[in-house]
Amino acid sequence: MAERANLVFHNKVIDGTAIKRLISRLIDHFGMAYTSHILDQVKALGFQQATATSISLGIDDLLTIPSKGWLVQDAEQQSLILEKHHHFGNVHAVEKLRQSIEIWYATSEYLRQEMNPNFRMTDPFNPVHIMSFSGARGNASQVHQLVGMRGLMSDPQGQMIDLPIQSNLREGLSLTEYIISCYGARKGVVDTAVRTSDAGYLTRRLVEVVQHIVVRRTDCGTTRGISVSPQKRTLPERIFIQTLIGRVLADDIYMGPRCIAIRNQDIGLGLVDRFRAFRTQPISIRTPFTCRSTSWICRLCYGRSPTHGDLVELGEAVGIIAGQSIGEPGTQLTLRTFHTGGVFTGGTAEHVRAPFNGKIKFNEDLVHPTRTRHGHPAFLCYRDLYVIIESEDIIHKVAIPPKSFLLVQNDQYVESEQVIAEIRAGTYTLNLKERVRKHIYSDSEGEMHWSTDVYHSPEFTYSNVHLLPKTSHLWILSGGSYKFSVVPFSLHKDQDQISIHYLSAERRYISRFSVNNDQVRHNLFSSDFSDKKEERIYDYSELNRIIGTGHCDFIYSAILHENADLLAKRRRNRFIIPFQLIQDQEKELMLHSHSGISMEIPINGIFRRKSILAFFDDPRYRRKSSGITKYGTLGAHSIVKREDVIEYRGVKKVKPKYQMKVDRFFFIPEEVHILSESSSIMVRNNSIIGVDTPITLNTRSQVGGLVRVERKKKRIELKIFSGNIYFPGERDKISRHSGILIPPGTGKTNSKESKKLKNWIYVQRITPTKKKYFVLVRPVTPYEIPDGLNLATLFPQDPFQEKDNMQLRAVNYILYGNGKPTRRISDTSIQLVRTCLVLSWDQDNKSSFAEEVCASFVEVRTNGLIRDFLRIDLVKSHIFYIRKRNDPSGSELISDNRSDRTNKNPFYSIYSNARIQQSFSQNHGTIHTLLNRNKESQSLIILSASNCFRMGPFNDVKYHNVIKQSIKKDPLIPIKNLLGPLGTAPKIANFYSSFYPLITHNQTSVAKYFELDNLKQAFQVLNYYLIAENGRIYNFDPCRNIFLNAVNLNWYFPHHHYHHNYCEETSTIISLGQFICENVCIAKSGPRLKSGQVFIVQADSIVIRSAKPYLATPGATVHGHYGETLYEGDTLVTFIYEKSRSGDITQGLPKVEQVLEVRSIDSISMNLEKRIEGWNECITRILGIPWGFVIGAELTIVQSRLSLVNKIQKVYRSQGVQIHNRHIEIIVRQITSKVLVSEDGMSNVFLPGELIGLLRAERTGRALEEAICYRAVLLGITRASLNTQSFISEASFQETARVLAKAALRGRIDWLKGLKENVVLGGMIPAGTGFKGLVHRSRQHNNILLETKKKNFFGGEMRDIFFHHRELFDSCISNNLHDTSGRSFIGIEFNDS
């Protein structure tokens, strides 16, 4: 009883850990037997008390946490604000997703932490509370789902579903929540079956690869090892111990002079502790990788058996054990037992908070601005940063680790508990990160704009994928495009206003073309792809009625459907204006599908005076047949200018043009066939044939006449001259006339009746033999050349254009020299005469005009149609701003310039009507031109994509000074402000717009110094006007809907009247073309604007074309071209971002499988196969061919094996599954043990492309004494199991019929070495007890001795070369040349292979 008094009385709730402690103390005191007796009594007591308490779980015991309501409400409020930010374009979709996930995750976690205090206060003996904290059943996070909120779920792929389940299981789920819950629940209703079968199939494939691996020897005699260093703490302690225990040493280990462990000794805990204590040199251990055979393994390379802790027994089927060990956790873990039913758990960042109110100070050089993962502005610090918080009397110093975000600015005042920095969650979440792509799709249709330069990503140079260099917005400018294919002529000009009724009326006259560009889907015109290419007939009667009888020289766009000139379009700086001639006089339409004006700009974009601007191929001078051009004895001089050098894909071609001084020339047709040497010709030289005579087997003549056959280099030229043959009487008379043109009206020289000729003829003398000759009279087509087709009339005249400034001279060039033959290629036609426009200008005013001018194409695009303008700058600019490829500062300034090298696709360029004359009017400045200092006023035109406007000359001094001042400060300012779609004209008298019919007031400043009086003096036109074709000016109501050239825009008009005192603090300038995000305040009491682009600015109102911004961060990929029309649902951007995975094996299994099947996991990760190719090439280059292959393959295989083992282990460890390395090593050894015979050195033994075992390749090479070239290759497990040596095993795995048929054709032999083959055939498996007989038999029969001539050839030479690389290369050295029973033979055991 005295003892009883000394006992301590505990009155405490006892939980799992306390019970453990109690039991261990009981065992120490009383031993096992007595303890078990005591525990039985405890158990009985427990049951008795539980019965008495009648603890049961009822639904009433699930108490919801009272704070849940407002916590959820708060989270919803935050989500709403986030949604708004996304709508305004402040954060992009990925940032929004991340932030919303973290908001809900934090809410859910907070609720979980609230749960315990809540139970403790309200009901400490609540059965649910007792159960969840006893450790007996259930844990806090499961109970949290019952009484807190279920939270975020992950779908079967482990992706987060960003809609959280707000209810808990006590309240019950809504329908949506239930479906989401099914995805993520344990034994999930949605995906368990699929997962389990996946895991089973993985196990099956793994076992298939390694089923034949059995322990067959005690020691294979290898000298290699893999070194593990205890000094470099790259591995965590636990993993280091796991790696060593149970392995066998490959080398002796010395500590100074003393040997502390010998080769082939297995490592136990004691040895590991000594290694760790002594920090010895790297320890070399044997692993399955070092074992010398691929078809079995020896005891020492395998090490200890995991079951009984001793060296593995002979005959143990370690392959199957390895396959099962890797596959089995997969089957277990698919059930999602790991986490509570797929509920998302991720790490959020730690926050550093300010301890008291004060001012922040830090070194600004150590940080640089960035965006946080949620899109907030922050500073990123590179190294440890000390932040000092100063208040009046206290100074506090906070150390912030590198790679953290600082959320405050220098000298900012912070309040107590304000978050000043965010420390990224530590390494424990690193293995739960993965990189994924997310595509963002467009919500509305419209036109694409971006506000910064973009790069082409290198692998997509010619497509529409661009990379963003910095954070910027992508804008989708709203506007529905009217889908007619192509407008064959366009009466409305760019930015006219038309009513919808007119559009629908016009649609009937539009023919639909089907255009298919196989590279990119162009939305230039929605095309009807019809299967039959049917020619459509235009209804021209209607068309004529529309055009009317007036001034009918139109050039209108038509798409060349199938046109030879498309080739010309593909050259960089050449554009074609296809047009049809409408001849007004005869009221008939001559339609030539091939006619068009082609303009060509020199590569550098500089025209000299008198250079050719454009050329026009007149269809009248086009021939379908070959022939010779003649223009008699009249003089012609050929001109070749520098501008005519066409650079096409880097090859320069100089094409001479012949300028004619004559008014006519002659074309003598002939039929030409160019045949290859080998073709058999069915007609003789100088014979006369009729029409449709077969010439060769598959060609027939199209005309009749005389045949001439000439043999040139490697080809035969066969000509057929049509015409009549005369045999002249007197020889000398004809010789004078040989090869001349005879005009009509003269008599024939050699005929009796002197008949007058009606047409021109060409007389040619032909002598088939020396004595015999005759004359061939050939028909001639004469061509008249007028004094030049006056192309100037094709363009409507600009009434205010100064005619004497820019001159266009039309000159006719003949393209073929006198007597030069013209050749027709396949089905194209030959152009004989080209009419060229020669550009020149007056040089009266020396100051303003230069010898050279800059020219460039500007593409202006309105939805559905592209317009290209030629821009010629006559003004000598003082300041040049030339766009560089990645210069961000000019991003808003530079229009989309066609002469720019960094261009997009110039293949389709459609010219619109009446554009070119505009380019020649006086003084067109460009974006290159700033205000010219020596003139009073200067006009400036900027054509940017789909935004065109023109600033006229400013005569008003006040306004001019403002601009001058701003130029002095920053010369780029005025251009920024002036960029915009519509223009201004101070005086209508000196500016007539032929293709900007909308003239608007340009810019209204809201600044104080810009008062309305000044504005009225500067700009007399305050409303905008429409100028009709005949020069009348219409003023119209600004509130009407405005349509941009077949594009329906959504307009938004804020009306507000400015007052003088109205904006004293703010001095915002609204400029044309500016993009405005939603809710930006322009002025204090001004309206809140919707997002869009400012289109028209007036004194009292602005018009905004509504647009939707999408934010994109650096590294994002933009799809589509600038200015392209996008439709709803098109892909806009692709982001690549890191995200937390839910810590669940749902990702584990696919990942393991991807590694084992050697598939690239995603486009970003390094692909192992690529790495292997690189290794192979480098080593071979360094060491030359034979050694390079041996060593290259060895090194590659060693590298990739270690890499693969680490990858697989990483996946399993992240799921908390411990698998011993040696199991993975056995599998990896099988998938890396094959090499691919390459074609570099052709050997007699193996075919190129054959897969053979690495050791077999080495041994064959030694036996043949010649190098076999091979390179390492990674097989996936499926391929490896279909490339084993046993066809029975392969056939039982997959593709049975194929494998058996192949084996039968090749006559393959199965040696029945694996387990599976023997099971299939009902034999005894060669493992366990059935193992001994196999070895005994093979020793007797399979030792075939081959005599070798050079005994020590390999041993000596290789040792000299590679003695210092012993660890890696000694596989190929002496040990393979073991002596059998004293004679010099090499024993090759075929059961090894």
UniProtKB/Swiss-Prot annotation:
Molecular function (Gene Ontology), one example: DNA binding
EC id: 2.7.7.6
Q: What is the superkingdom listed in this entry's lineage?
A: Eukaryota
Keywords for this protein:
Chloroplast, DNA-directed RNA polymerase, Metal-binding, Nucleotidyltransferase, Plastid, Transcription, Transferase, Zinc
Q: Which InterPro entries match?
A: DNA-dir_RpoC2_beta_pp (IPR012756), RNA_pol_beta''_euk (IPR050254), RNA_pol_Rpb1_3_sf (IPR042102), RNA_pol_Rpb1_4 (IPR007083), RNA_pol_Rpb1_5 (IPR007081), Rpb1_funnel_sf (IPR038120)
| Tagged with keyword Nucleotide-binding | no
Its cofactor is: Zn(2+)
Looking up Pfam families in the UniProt record yields: RNA_pol_Rpb1_4 (PF05000), RNA_pol_Rpb1_5 (PF04998)
Q: Which residues take part in binding Zn(2+)?
A: C220, C291, C298, C301
What's this protein's function?
A: DNA-dependent RNA polymerase catalyzes the transcription of DNA into RNA using the four ribonucleoside triphosphates as substrates.
Q: What is this protein called?
A: DNA-directed RNA polymerase subunit beta''
Organism listed in the record = Gossypium hirsutum
The major lineage groups are: Eukaryota, Viridiplantae, Streptophyta, Embryophyta, Tracheophyta
Q: Which gene encodes it?
A: rpoC2
